[in-house]
């Protein structure tokens, strides 16, 4: 081969065992590489960390790397939890399981597998769901924070690329098998949940060339539980209101209570297969297949103290606490007293059916099948490197749900005189010590007994909501890449073309019935075979004494296994009871359908350079995208019949994305990096659709798409310094700055509520705000029973202002292996630590206080005309976060302990409501989590270990309005232990 590669280029090509095989280089080049550049083999924690560090060091852009053993010895069960180890990355969790990833404060990232785009189960753009990917099938991963022109567009924070084992790089036959069992501290199921994973790989050579194959698979079950108590105190009893409960001061009464028991049962199957063939030293062909099946069954329950607000005028708290709201939008919101402990009694003279006890069974499950296929080849000549591949990613998801609600009919209190299917139950509450605790006031008048609470005759059917929505996502792509090598300061020129076609299709398949009268609601003895006692261990997490222990729900396990049978039984009960309503099987909703496709053509050109201590690349990426959206237009004729017609809209856009990366090796052990580039973030598919889906509840907002939503534009700058002061050790500091234009933000419009009665508009159109929901229950928001009410709306819009994200990242990795003579056994220790400080500023899109919240703020500020609003900012961004890992590896023992902490951040994940409480995203308080693992090599072929997640059972606290203001939600999570 005439072209001669530089040592730096050779280092990049020879890194580790996880990259693509570079067998296509000529023997002369391979020999030089082997002589001049150290190749680090992955074997054990220490070696894998060193290998990952070496790979990062010789990259021409800013990339973070984790490799095989590094992943395998962490107590991480899915992709999100693996990524939490990287500087600048935080994760969000659902019931303790990592489900979301923020890179440099943003969720707007991309996920690839072997460089192929992935698609998720929903309608987002970030790729495959993080909880769907088992850590056991990942051989390594890269997070590109500063892209080059080759990098596919679409990420704001970074691009995550998962790597699988390359067959032709195996130096010997690979065979491994792992068996584990996991236990959750809060689950009611006994025993261990199984986890199995295995890998086989080998390569061989004959007259037709060299062949290699790797097959990996995993099967895992997981049972995770979290308790999420909720207390609403978003109303006002003014001192001058004249009601019986009024005090000499204004205070916040109790509005609503929820005892939310979340349980998710995961069954995850992953398969990865790779085949490679190299007919000669210059040519390689490959085929990859990644198949994932994820089944997440929800078996959750909710106990609700509803109608509590009806007693606000007479219920006097026993004690109060002072709530300081802080400031929003530059306005000091002052402070107020809030109910802390007390009893909400039954007062038949005031209200003959409130407060009441409502019992729900939630089974919002997800079944997803994801497939990724990749076929391609590459050829290396004297001056050229050419590669081409076709790839297909798909994800088909069904979200089966069968949610039911029962009302408890208290036999010690009279039936509602108006015929409603609920009646009064007394409650008590104690919110001291940061515990949102409530339960039945057992010593109060009309209190039911345990036997009465568990008697099927004392519950009636209230709601049935069935859904079987489907989402089909795909991306098919073809790309070809060329490299021309030069013997100048410009070492090579890369250029290429990529075509992709992506789409998302959704069908809203549902049915529902709401029963509001005793005349229509069958009692539980008519469907008693469906009823079970709800979980009675709500005190296991924090030892609380006050909670609702005894109640009945429709068996969520039976619903999951036989939904049609449950539906048939409920309909038979309604028929026997003589109900005027009926339950139908789920059908497709015309208003909830959309089918969106986009085609993209992308070209790039990039020059790679190396001169003395400088190296890097500069280039440009150009793309054109055309979007076609199909939805339904629904009108009503003169006779009231629904007329459905399909409407197709098209749009297009193009962008030029320049990118540059410069690396300076200023000393043998010091590297400086600079990166600058432009990228875009496309809107989520459902944010473009004008299709709408209504809920039978008056509380959730209705999501309305925005077909005029345009991609975000982001310009990023990176500056970093890395000091490799010892073998396998580094200290680094980096600065990043991102300017975002047309940020996608949530615009929420809340319906008007009368400050005295709390009633909403019950007729269409909703002049005071929101949208008319024809099937929503009026509930406490109107004077009479029925359906049809104004509810809130939420729509994604482009922020008209420019926003900025900037921050500093610090990291240190230190290994004591070099001090074995001085330290002996203690030389097995090592430490990794990172710290990120970041901030978000700018933007003009604002959230505004709800009408009830405005009444409270008028009282706390003395300004009756106050209008409180604040820039929404960026959700899920913690300004400060750190991660510390201490490990030990010696004498066959491999142990790690990792503590992760992140500062408070605003979130839209706040349990049993989808509306912004008080009109603003909730604030999730500071939280840390401790994980650990210990493994021991019994011999060369057998390893045993134990892993622990959330050892200290760290709780989640969420506040309304501001951090530390009004505690609204809790998340009491489990500890999970895995052995094997």
Language model region names:
Residues 151, 167-173, 205-211, 282, ...:
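Short loop/turn motifs that connect adjacent beta-strands in outer-membrane beta-barrel proteins
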Residues 118-145, 198:
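Short acidic/polar hinge/loop motifs at secondary-structure boundaries
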Residues 517, 739-741, 900-913, 935-980:
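C-terminal beta-signal and adjacent terminal beta-strands/loops
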Residues 739, 749, 756-911, 952:
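Gram-negative outer-membrane beta-barrel transporters
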Residues 41-72, 116-121:
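N-terminal periplasmic "start-of-domain" segments of outer-membrane beta-barrel proteins
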Residues 80-118, 145:
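Extracytoplasmic beta-strand/coil segments of soluble accessory domains associated
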Residues 366-370, 596-599, 651, 680-740, ...:
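Outer-membrane beta-barrel signature, preferentially recognizing the C-terminal barrel domain
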Residues 189-341, 346, 366-376, 382, ...:
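Transmembrane beta-barrel wall of Gram-negative outer-membrane proteins
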């Amino acid at each position: 081969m005439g072209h001669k590669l530089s040592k730096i280029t050779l280092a990049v090509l020879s890194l580790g065992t996880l990259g693509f095989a570079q067998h296509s280089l000529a023997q002369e080049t391979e020999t030089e590489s082997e002589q001049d550049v150290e190749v680090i083999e992955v074997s054990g924690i220490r070696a894998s960390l060193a290998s990952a560090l070496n790979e990062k060091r010789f990259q021409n852009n800013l990339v973070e790397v984790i490799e095989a053993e590094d992943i395998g010895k962490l107590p991480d069960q899915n992709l999100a939890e693996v990524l939490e180890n990287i500087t600048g990355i935080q994760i969000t969790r659902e019931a303790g399981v990592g489900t979301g990833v923020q890179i440099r404060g943003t969720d707007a990232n991309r996920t690839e597998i072997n460089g192929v785009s992935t698609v998720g189960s929903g309608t987002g753009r970030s790729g495959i769901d993080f909880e769907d990917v088992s850590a056991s099938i990942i051989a390594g991963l890269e997070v590109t924070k500063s892209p080059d022109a080759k990098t596919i567009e679409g990420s704001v924070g970074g691009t995550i690329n998962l790597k699988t084992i390359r067959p032709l790089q195996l130096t010997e036959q690979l065979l491994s098998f792992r068996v584990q069992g996991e236990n959750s501290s809060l689950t009611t199921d006994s025993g261990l949940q199984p986890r199995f994973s295995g890998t086989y790989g080998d390569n061989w050579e004959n007259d037709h060339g060299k062949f290699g194959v790797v097959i990996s698979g995993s099967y895992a079950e997981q049972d995770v539980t979290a308790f999420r108590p909720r207390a609403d105190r978003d109303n006002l009893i003014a001192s001058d209101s004249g009601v019986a409960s009024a005090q000499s001061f204004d205070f916040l009464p109790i509005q609503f209570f929820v005892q939310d028991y979340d349980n998710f049962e995961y069954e995850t199957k992953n398969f990865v297969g790779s085949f490679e063939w190299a007919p000669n030293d210059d040519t390689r062909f490959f085929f990859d297949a990644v198949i994932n099946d994820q089944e997440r069954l929800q078996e959750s329950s909710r106990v609700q103290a509803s109608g509590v607000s009806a007693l606000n005028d007479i219920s006097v708290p026993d004690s109060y606490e002072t709530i300081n709201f802080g400031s929003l939008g530059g306005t000091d919101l002052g402070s107020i007293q809030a109910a802390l402990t007390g009893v909400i009694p039954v007062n038949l003279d005031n209200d003959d059916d409130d407060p009441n006890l409502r019992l729900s069974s939630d089974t919002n499950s997800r079944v997803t099948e994801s497939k990724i296929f990749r076929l391609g080849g590459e050829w290396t000549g004297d001056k050229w490197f050419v590669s081409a591949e076709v790839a297909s990613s798909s994800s088909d998801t069904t979200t089966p749900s069968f949610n039911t609600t029962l009302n408890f009919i208290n036999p010690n209190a009279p039936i509602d005189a108006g015929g409603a299917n609920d009646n009064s139950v007394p409650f008590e509450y104690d919110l001291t010590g940061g515990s949102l605790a409530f339960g039945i006031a057992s010593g109060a008048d009309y209190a039911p007994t345990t036997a009465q609470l568990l008697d099927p005759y004392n519950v009636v059917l209230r709601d049935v909501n069935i859904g079987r929505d489907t989402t089909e996502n795909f991306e098919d792509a073809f790309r070809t890449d060329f490299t021309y090598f030069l013997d100048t300061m410009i070492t090579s020129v890369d250029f290429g073309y990529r075509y992709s076609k992506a789409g998302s299709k959704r069908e809203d398949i549902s049915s529902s019935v709401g029963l509001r009268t005793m005349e229509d609601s069958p009692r539980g003895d008519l469907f008693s075979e469906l009823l079970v006692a709800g979980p009675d261990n709500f005190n296991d997490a924090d030892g609380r004494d006050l909670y609702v222990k005894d109640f009945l729900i429709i068996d969520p396990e039976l619903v999951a296994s036989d939904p049609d049978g449950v539906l048939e039984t409920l309909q038979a009960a309604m028929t026997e009871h003589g109900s005027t309503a009926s339950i139908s099987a789920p059908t497709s909703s015309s208003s909830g359908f959309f089918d969106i496709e986009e085609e993209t053509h992308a070209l790039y050109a990039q020059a790679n350079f190396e001169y003395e201590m400088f190296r890097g690349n500069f280039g440009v990426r150009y793309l054109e995208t055309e979007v076609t959206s199909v939805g339904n237009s629904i009108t009503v004729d003169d006779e009231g019949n629904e007329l459905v017609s399909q409407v197709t809209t098209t749009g297009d856009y193009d962008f030029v994305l320049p990118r540059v990366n410069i690396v300076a090796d200023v000393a043998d052990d010091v590297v400086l990096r600079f990166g600058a580039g432009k990228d875009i973030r496309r809107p989520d598919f459902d944010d473009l659709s004008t299709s709408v889906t209504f809920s039978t509840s008056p509380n959730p907002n209705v999501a309305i798409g925005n077909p005029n939503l345009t991609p975000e534009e982001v310009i990023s700058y990176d500056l970093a310094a890395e000091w490799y002061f010892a073998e396998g050790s580094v200290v680094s500091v980096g600065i990043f700055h991102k300017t975002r234009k047309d940020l996608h933000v949530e615009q929420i419009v809340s319906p008007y509520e009368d400050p005295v009665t709390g009633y909403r508009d019950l007729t269409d159109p909703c002049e005071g705000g929101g949208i008319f929901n024809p099937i929503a229950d009026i509930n406490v928001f109107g004077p009479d029973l029925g359906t049809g009410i104004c509810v809130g709306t939420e729509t994604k819009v482009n922020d008209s202002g420019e926003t900025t994200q900037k921050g500093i990242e610090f990291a240190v990795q230190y290994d004591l292996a070099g001090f074995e003579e001085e330290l002996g056994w203690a030389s097995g220790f090592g430490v990794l630590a990172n710290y990120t400080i970041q901030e978000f500023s700018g933007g003009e899109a604002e959230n505004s206080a709800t009408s009830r919240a405005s009444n409270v703020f008028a009282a706390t500020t003395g300004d009756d005309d106050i209008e409180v609003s604040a820039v929404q900012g960026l959700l899920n961004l913690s300004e400060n976060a750190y991660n510390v890992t201490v490990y030990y590896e010696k004498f066959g023992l491999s142990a790690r302990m990792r503590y992760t902490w992140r500062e408070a951040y605003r979130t839209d994940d706040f349990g049993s409501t989808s509306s912004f409480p008080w009109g603003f995203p909730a604030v999730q308080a500071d939280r840390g989590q401790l994980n650990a693992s210990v493994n021991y090599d019994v011999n060369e072929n057998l390893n045993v270990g134990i892993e622990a997640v959330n050892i200290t059972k760290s709780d989640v606290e969420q506040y309304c309005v501001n951090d530390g203001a009004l505690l609204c939600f809790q998340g009491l999570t489990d500890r999970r232990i895995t052995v094997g």
